Amino acid sequence: MSIFIGGAWPYANGSLHLGHIASLLPGDILARYYRAKGEHVLYVSGSDCNGTPITIRAKQEGVTVKEIADKYHEEFERCFRSLGFTYDCYTRTDSEHHHETVQKVFLRLLEEGYIYKKVVEQAYCETCTQFLPDRYVEGICPHCHEAARGDQCDACSAILDPLDLLEKKCKLCGSTPSVQETEHFYFALHKFQQQIKEAVEIAKQKGTWRDNAIQLTERYLKEGLQDRAVSRDLPIGVPIPVAGYEDKKIYVWIEAVTGYYSASKHWVEETGKDDQEFWDKEAKTYYVHGKDNIPFHSIIWPAVLLGIGEEAIPRHIVSNEYLTVEKRKLSTSKNWAVWVPDILERYNPDSIRYFLTVNAPENRDTDFSWREFIYSHNSELLGAYGNFVNRTLKFIEKYYGGTVPKGSIDVELKDKVEGLYKSVGEAIEQTKFKVALETIFDAVRFANKYFDEKQPWKQREDDPVSCEETIYNCVYLIANFAQLLEPFLPFSSERVRNTLSSVKVNWEPQNTLPNRIDNVQPLFERIDVKQIEHEVEKLYGAVK
């Protein structure tokens, strides 16, 4: 089976925060799971280095756009690597291969009659002497009357035209823009209304899109899909490949999402492999992002793919809701966020992955609190999983000199483990990651109970053969937990496999156990609960 996984592209205008990771982590869980099953996986993403936010940040800091893009792209790569993300290709939108691919897609859509020219009115700043791209205009949403950008309202998810905003202001200088005529290219989205409607119906029947993606897309379809501008007067970006229009740039509506396609082509260049299997209609595709990116993946990207004749339109849309911080809406401008480079300096990446999965905003907004984060680490990772692994392996080290005792696998335990691979695998494929991880930890708690009830410390004296059976079965459980938890907790899983001299990762019961164990070390360290107060004070102290 061919599995394509696309993770949304973060803007390279500032550090990643936990809200980004909460929405992107499911992509890595999927990639690790399907690879363990032996499927062909292509997992791609990259840094958006062309967006308006980067230009604005560069102007604010008095540096070049490239300096800003380079700084954060490199930081993103480090953060994703430290968190265990396993992208097959992580690239950037200011690269030559991305520009070439986007231009080819633009020309193909133009040739097929899906892109046309149109004279329109656009916001123009007399002070800055330039036409203002959508994100350069800020004001009040005409639908919900909350603060909004010129392209989209985060409060009500309405797609906007900058001229629709009330109380319009130029983001750069704060002055009120005028309105002037200019010519732009438009994407004929209305031509794809029926095909996208059919795709939504299929997703609804099969449950392959998150509810928020279905509801929002149905809303847009009910209103009727509106043609969208796909060119803008921007200082950076992909130039329009049409004579006389080279000064205009291909707009984010099709440029950013085409990054999935350009990353795939870049992967081909790097590896010499063929990517066509991932764009075939039989391919299983997953697009992983936050709910603010839904229309790009449920409407724009399917329309682009249909327009260029590719059949692998998004089959699974994994659109998480928002993550709040200490019960407050995350705000980068006010510095109310938990920044990824910062948390990685002090905490285990598996602790971060665990919390953001069991507390994932899969169907509703969820909250990150330092209290819950630290208590979940101490009680679940250290107290349940780490405790079971450590008490078993230390027992072997102490009483058997590191040699795993011989035994036979308990039939009840074997059935339980085989059932785990099936139920956890199904939950992952259905993008129910929280359910999948909770199912494994239910089994971890069962394993601790098994150890306690068997009382091997007593069996060793009273019934040595039964003690060997107990410990053998505990090692059997540990070996399988290391496989089952690999998509979620890759670092601790690798450490367990190394201790058991089991290198291979595959999604099937591990029935062959090691003869010896080596170098038993605790999987997790206890976090001092005093850290809670320290972290909360630090968070409040950094607020602007």
From Swiss-Prot:
Residues at which ATP binds: T332
Main location: cytoplasm
PROSITE patterns assigned: AA_TRNA_LIGASE_I
Cellular localisation: Cytoplasm
InterPro entries in UniProt: aa-tRNA-synth_I_CS, Anticodon_Met, Met-tRNA_ligase_1, Met-tRNA_synth, Methionyl/Leucyl_tRNA_Synth, MetRS_core, MetRS_Zn, Rossmann-like_a/b/a_fold
Residues spanned by motif 'HIGH' region: 10-20
The keyword ATP-binding belongs to this UniProt entry's keyword annotation: yes
GO cellular component, one term: cytosol
Motif 'KMSKS' region per record, residues: 329-333
GO terms, biological process: methionyl-tRNA aminoacylation
Enzyme Commission no: 6.1.1.10
Coiled-coil segments: none
Key word Ligase present: yes
Cofactor entry: Zn(2+)
Binding site for Zn(2+): C141, C144, C153, C156
Transmembrane segments: none
Any GO molecular function: methionine-tRNA ligase activity
Keywords on record: Aminoacyl-tRNA synthetase, ATP-binding, Cytoplasm, Ligase, Metal-binding, Nucleotide-binding, Protein biosynthesis, Zinc
Cofactor note: Binds 1 zinc ion per subunit.
Role description: Is required not only for elongation of protein synthesis but also for the initiation of all mRNA translation through initiator tRNA(fMet) aminoacylation.
Quaternary context: Monomer.
Family of this protein: Belongs to the class-I aminoacyl-tRNA synthetase family. MetG type 1 subfamily.
UniProt xrefs under HAMAP family: Met_tRNA_synth_type1
Protein name: Methionine--tRNA ligase
Gene name per UniProt: metG
